Amino acid sequence: MESYIIDTYQGVPYTAAVQVDLIEKDSNPATLTVWFPLFQSSTPAPVLLDQLKTLSITTQYTASPEGPVLQVNAAAQGAAMSALPKKFAVSAAVALDEYSRLEFGTLTVCDVRSIYLTTLKPYGMVSKIMTDVRSVGRKTHDLIALCDFIDIEKGVPITIPAYIKAVSIKDSESATVEAAISGEADQAITQARIAPYAGLILIMTMNNPKGIFKKLGAGMQVIVELGPYVQAESLGKICKTWNHQRTRYVLRSR
């Protein structure tokens, strides 16, 4: 079993983001990834990771109003595991690799192949932005983050688009606002890195948020889900070899 700590915050308490790679116990095993709901811990990260290695997990492929999901049941040993969520659901589209199939409605016993623990700031200092492009009210534009990485192993640049939010802007103002957004982002974000959670996330630490970012307080860590965009690559490989270069912002008319 492989295990990794992605350390973005060294204080106590911290928010734990746990993702686990699994393989089905079956003659034709499926490989899948599940991620636990965020939880807060004061246990040192190496100790928490050791206790996570005792995880036993079952999944069940089923349906929900949001689409196909995996219902996850988990158990683990250790005092720190009392804070670990034990029952939850994850998107099957992100959890399953493109070659794997699970039988609908059947309880699946899984072996743990790798565990990723990312330490984030405490509750109240972490803001999670979902990649959800559904309309909200009378919005005119979508704010998109273009996350530029380089594969340091191959020297290949990669750009991942991530939906941030819907905004209302007049067409006559869009060019000016887009220029301002770019400037605001340059000043607002002091650090950005990727980590394995919900497939993959971009963690941005905000320094001096203003303008379109002003609702995010200074010192906040902002999480943007990237998982749906990178299913073709091994998450472990991405975390080891992709280096974040910059994040640009653009407005797209609806």
From Swiss-Prot:
Subcellular location(s) of the protein: Virion; Host cytoplasm; Host nucleus; Host cell membrane
Transmembrane segments: none
GO process terms (BP): virion assembly
A Pfam family matched in the record: Matrix_Pneumo_C
Keywords: Host cell membrane, Host cytoplasm, Host membrane, Host nucleus, Membrane, Viral matrix protein, Virion
Keyword Membrane: yes
Coiled coil residues, start to end: none
Keyword Cell membrane set for record: no
GO terms for MF: structural constituent of virion
Domain of life: Viruses
Membrane association type: Peripheral membrane protein
Annotated Gene Ontology cellular component terms: host cell cytoplasm; host cell nucleus; host cell plasma membrane; membrane; viral envelope
Family as reported in the entry's similarity comment: Belongs to the pneumovirinae M protein family.
Subunit structure: Forms dimers. Forms higher-order oligomers. Interacts with glycoprotein G (via N-terminus). Interacts with protein M2-1; this interaction directs the matrix protein localization to cytoplasmic inclusions comprising viral proteins L, N, P, and M2-1 and mediates the matrix protein association with the nucleocapsid.
Role of this protein: Plays a crucial role in virus assembly into filaments and budding. Early in infection, localizes in the nucleus where it may inhibit host cell transcription. Later in infection, traffics to the cytoplasm to associate with inclusion bodies, the site of viral transcription and replication. During virus assembly and budding, acts as a bridge between the nucleocapsid and the lipid bilayer.
Name of the protein: Matrix protein
Organism: Turkey rhinotracheitis virus
The encoding gene: M
